[in-house]
Structures are given as C-alpha cells and as structure tokens.
Amino acid sequence: GDWGTCSWPGQECEHDSDCCGSFCCVGRRCLHIYFPCNLSRS
C-alpha cells in the first residue's frame, strides 16, 4: 500500500491495499501474514 496513508497491523482497513507494505486486510484489520494475502483467505 501507500506508505503515506497506509494502515499498520491492528489498524482498520477495507482492502489489502489499505495496509502498509505486504500486510493483509483480514476481518477489517491489517495483519502481518507470512504468505500471500489471497492464500490466507482460500
């Protein structure tokens, strides 16, 4: 996501792109996951 306005883990999000770097948006919160975001939801 955009480093200027991105959300860090624990902050609210709507999409993975709302989260900083490669953090994933899960349950409307950014999380640090050790594999691609899409795999975490399959």
UniProtKB/Swiss-Prot annotation:
Q: Which cysteines are joined by disulfide bonds?
A: C6-C20, C13-C25, C19-C30, C24-C37
Query: Keywords on this record?
Result: Disulfide bond, Ion channel impairing toxin, Neurotoxin, Secreted, Toxin
Q: In which tissues is it expressed?
A: Expressed by the venom duct.
Top-level taxon in the UniProt lineage: Eukaryota
Q: Which GO terms describe its cellular component?
A: extracellular region
Q: Name the protein family.
A: Belongs to the conotoxin I1 superfamily.
- UniProt comment concerning the protein's domains: The cysteine framework is XI (C-C-CC-CC-C-C).
Write down what this protein is called: Conotoxin Au11.6
Species source reads Conus aulicus (Princely cone)
- Supply the source organism's classification: Eukaryota, Metazoa, Spiralia, Lophotrochozoa, Mollusca
